[in-house]
């Protein structure tokens, strides 16, 4: 008798987040086209991961060519803590009984309080040069960890890859 409710949890697939200038379709598609996106299968955090080069800031999703060591700025803001139950508008198109049956009164119902970000972990991936190259040292998960002080405003850090110019290889960070 729980099959309908349980089925919604088996393949949730996570959430996609898009940096956009608005909530309209055109703004969201523009953010997707720029690849200013990230995914989360957990809390609904806010995340910025930017390359800081001279006076230029390139947002996540940007492809660029560099000869010097890259410098990054990462900011993460915690998800809203959830209030019990469902918001009032949840039952405008569905009866309270049906909402209780399907959701067991568990809805997205954010408070004004955000969870704290305890740390930021950065992963570094360097693609293979040849099929014979061992990938064990190319995927560094986790490459760098930065501890964060508790704050409702989130956590912001900057770091540099001091090996990039020396290694002179394509690299992906996230």
For the regions a protein language model found, what residue spans apply to each?
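C-terminal functional module detector
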Residues: 1-174
């Amino acid at each position: 008798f729980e099959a309908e409710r349980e089925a919604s949890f088996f393949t949730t697939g996570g959430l996609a987040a898009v940096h956009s200038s608005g909530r309209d379709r055109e703004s969201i598609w523009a953010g997707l086209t720029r690849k200013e996106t990230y995914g989360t299968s957990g809390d609904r955090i806010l995340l910025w991961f930017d390359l800081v080069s001279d006076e230029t800031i390139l947002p996540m999703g940007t492809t660029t060519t560099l000869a010097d060591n890259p410098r990054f700025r990462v900011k993460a803001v915690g998800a809203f803590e959830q209030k019990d139950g469902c918001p009032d508008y949840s039952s405008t198109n569905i009866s309270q009984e049906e909402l209780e049956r399907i959701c067991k009164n568990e809805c997205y119902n954010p408070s004004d309080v955000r969870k704290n970000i305890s740390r930021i972990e950065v992963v570094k991936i360097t693609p293979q040069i040849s099929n014979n190259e061992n990938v064990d040292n190319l995927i560094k998960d986790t490459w760098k960890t930065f501890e964060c002080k508790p704050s409702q405003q989130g956590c912001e850090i900057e770091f540099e890859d001091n090996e990039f110019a020396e290694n002179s290889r394509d690299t992906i960070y996230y």
